[in-house]
A protein has these predicted regions:
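Short secondary-structure boundary segments
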Residues: 1-14, 59-60, 64-72, 154
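Short, acidic loop-to-helix structural element flanking the phosphoryl-transfer center
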Residues: 1-24, 31-46, 78-87
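Short beta-strand segments at enzyme active-site cores
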Residues: 20-26, 59-64, 126
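Short glycine/serine/threonine-biased micro-segments
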Residues: 23, 27, 31, 105, ...
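Short, charge-patterned binding micro-sites
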Residues: 25-32, 64-70
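Asp-based, Mg2+/Mn2+-dependent phosphohydrolase catalytic module
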Residues: 37-41, 45-60, 68-105, 109-171
Length: 171
């Protein structure tokens, strides 16, 4: 099982380095009727409460409640907000100044990394969740994977980002 305290510590390091932390998440469970948008918002609020115990927090959450095939009612639709679309990134960009050259998308699915690349930010696939298997499959193919870097954990991804930032500052 993944240690969420390590996750909070990694996020805190990024916050301490001046990064804004933005979550963009597909929530097809809303479209499928498994849970409500209020449930998603409550979960995000709870996540921040847990993270704040370790000095970290998420600056903003953006979610897509739609699904093009399995949705119910207003939630069954094609949209640009669902990753790999860039709609949630564009919403975040309206709320926060984004320096794309110094921004990163971290995710455990190729939809995440593809969305980041489409938006013009570097993408990191992490090995937690689905990432390790996807990375293994990508290595077996003789083509460039749809991500810029692979890290086994969020801690490794954060360290890579911080090292890259340090290198840029010292040039």
């Amino acid at each position: 099982r993944y240690d969420l305290r390590l996750c909070a510590q990694a996020l805190k390091k990024l916050k301490d380095a001046g990064y804004k932390l933005i979550v963009v998440t597909n929530q097809a469970g809303v479209a499928r009727g498994y849970y409500t948008e209020d449930d998603v918002k409550n979960l995000h609020q709870y996540m921040n409460q847990v993270l704040q115990k370790d000095g970290a927090w998420i600056d903003a959450f953006y979610y897509c409640p739609h699904h093009p095939v399995h949705g119910i009612g207003i939630y069954k639709k094609e949209c640009n907000c669902r990753k790999p679309g860039t709609g949630m990134f564009e919403m975040a960009e309206k709320d926060f100044p984004v320096d794309k050259a110094a921004s990163y998308m971290i995710g455990d699915k190729l939809l995440d990394t593809e969305a980041g690349q489409r938006f013009g930010v570097a993408s990191i696939l992490v090995g937690t969740g689905y990432g390790a298997e996807l990375h293994k499959e990508a290595q077996e193919k003789d083509e460039k994977p749809p991500y810029d870097h692979y890290a086994d954990t969020l801690e490794e991804a954060a360290q890579w980002i911080l090292e890259k930032k340090w290198k840029i500052k010292t040039k």
